[in-house]
C-alpha cells in the first residue's frame, strides 16, 4: 500500500477543514434565514389575542433561542480557531429539553425524566467550568 507523505496528509487535512468551514458557513446562513422567519412568526403570534397563541409564543421563543445558540456556536467555532466548546452543546441541550417540556408535558413521569436530564446537563456544565477540566 502506498504511504502518504506528511505534506500530502497536511494537504488532505487542509482541504477537509476548508470543506467543513464552507459547510458550517452555509449552515450559519441558513440558520440566519430561519431566525428571521421565526422572528416574523413570533411577531404574528404576539398580536393574536387567543390563549393558544400565547402557548405558541412561548414555544416560538424557545425555538428562537435554539437558532440563536446554534448561530453563536458557529461564530464561536470560527473565533476560537476551529474548535467547538463543549459547553455550547450543553446549553443547546438544556434549551432543547426545556422546549420539549413546554411542548410535550402530557405525563408527569416524562416531565420528571426531562428535568433529571436538565439536572444532569447542568452538572456537566458545572464540571466543564470547574478548574479540573478547564482548558487554557
Curated annotation (Swiss-Prot):
<protein>
    <recommendedName>
        <fullName>Protein PsiE</fullName>
    </recommendedName>
</protein>
<feature type="transmembrane region" description="Helical">
    <location>
        <begin position="15"/>
        <end position="35"/>
    </location>
</feature>
<keyword id="KW-0812">Transmembrane</keyword>
<dbReference type="InterPro" id="IPR009315">
    <property type="entry name" value="P_starv_induced_PsiE"/>
</dbReference>
<keyword id="KW-0472">Membrane</keyword>
<comment type="similarity">
    <text>Belongs to the PsiE family.</text>
</comment>
<dbReference type="GO" id="GO:0005886">
    <property type="term" value="C:plasma membrane"/>
</dbReference>
<feature type="transmembrane region" description="Helical">
    <location>
        <begin position="108"/>
        <end position="128"/>
    </location>
</feature>
<dbReference type="Pfam" id="PF06146">
    <property type="entry name" value="PsiE"/>
</dbReference>
<keyword id="KW-1133">Transmembrane helix</keyword>
<dbReference type="InterPro" id="IPR020948">
    <property type="entry name" value="P_starv_induced_PsiE-like"/>
</dbReference>
<keyword id="KW-1003">Cell membrane</keyword>
<feature type="transmembrane region" description="Helical">
    <location>
        <begin position="82"/>
        <end position="102"/>
    </location>
</feature>
<dbReference type="GO" id="GO:0016036">
    <property type="term" value="P:cellular response to phosphate starvation"/>
</dbReference>
<feature type="transmembrane region" description="Helical">
    <location>
        <begin position="55"/>
        <end position="75"/>
    </location>
</feature>
<keyword id="KW-0997">Cell inner membrane</keyword>
Amino acid at each position: 500500500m502506498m504511504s502518504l507523505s506528511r505534506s500530502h496528509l497536511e494537504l488532505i487535512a487542509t482541504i477537509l477543514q476548508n470543506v467543513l468551514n464552507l459547510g458550517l458557513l452555509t449552515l450559519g446562513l441558513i440558520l440566519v434565514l430561519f431566525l428571521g422567519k421565526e422572528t416574523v412568526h413570533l411577531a404574528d403570534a404576539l398580536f393574536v389575542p387567543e390563549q393558544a397563541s400565547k402557548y405558541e409564543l412561548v414555544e416560538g421563543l424557545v425555538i428562537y433561542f435554539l437558532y440563536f445558540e446554534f448561530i453563536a456556536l458557529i461564530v464561536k467555532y470560527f473565533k476560537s480557531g476551529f474548535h467547538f466548546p463543549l459547553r455550547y452543546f450543553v446549553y443547546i441541550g438544556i434549551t432543547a429539553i426545556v422546549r420539549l417540556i413546554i411542548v410535550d408535558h402530557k405525563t408527569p413521569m416524562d416531565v420528571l425524566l426531562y428535568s433529571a436530564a436538565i439536572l444532569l446537563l447542568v452538572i456537566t456544565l458545572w464540571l466543564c467550568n470547574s478548574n479540573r477540566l478547564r482548558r487554557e
